[in-house]
């Protein structure tokens, strides 16, 4: 069994913001795989199903971003999975809008949700899929930027990224993270 966790903030005011792209990815995975996100437990909204021939739990922690580790820890403990059996999906301002980066370990890179998960797990060795949301303009505050919605011109890149995340998760579950990294960690070149 695997647990796939998308990071974001609960409540309507944060829907469709850059920081909630992890929640959007979980919604896309649920839709693509006929999984109902209809259970509230372990400080998360969850759904059970199958992806890539593996049993999965999809989860959207409801603790607010900076406390995501509380929910992740509860999920891991309850379902008795190892840190190698989780995938965390979240926003990354260091990547171009829509670019994916899959990693199996690494620092939080300034992301407070990941920092909290690392603290609760006592390890940075877990699979994560970063979705590029672009760097903030010089005159923007970081919090205002990540809590802003995507402008219309970026929406096609985000839709495409969510489609790729769905395929990347299936690849990780079926073939492993290394194969997925080779397939999806490519920067698109516009010619």
Swiss-Prot record:
Cell location: Cytoplasm
InterPro entries in alphabetical order: Pept_tRNA_hydro (IPR001328), Pept_tRNA_hydro_CS (IPR018171), Pept_tRNA_hydro_sf (IPR036416)
Annotated site location: Stabilizes the basic form of H active site to accept a proton: 91
Site (Discriminates between blocked and unblocked aminoacyl-tRNA): 9
Recorded family membership: Belongs to the PTH family.
Described function: Hydrolyzes ribosome-free peptidyl-tRNAs (with 1 or more amino acids incorporated), which drop off the ribosome during protein synthesis, or as a result of ribosome stalling. Catalyzes the release of premature peptidyl moieties from peptidyl-tRNA molecules trapped in stalled 50S ribosomal subunits, and thus maintains levels of free tRNAs and 50S ribosomes.
Protein's recorded name: Peptidyl-tRNA hydrolase
Annotated source species: Lachnoclostridium phytofermentans (strain ATCC 700394 / DSM 18823 / ISDg)
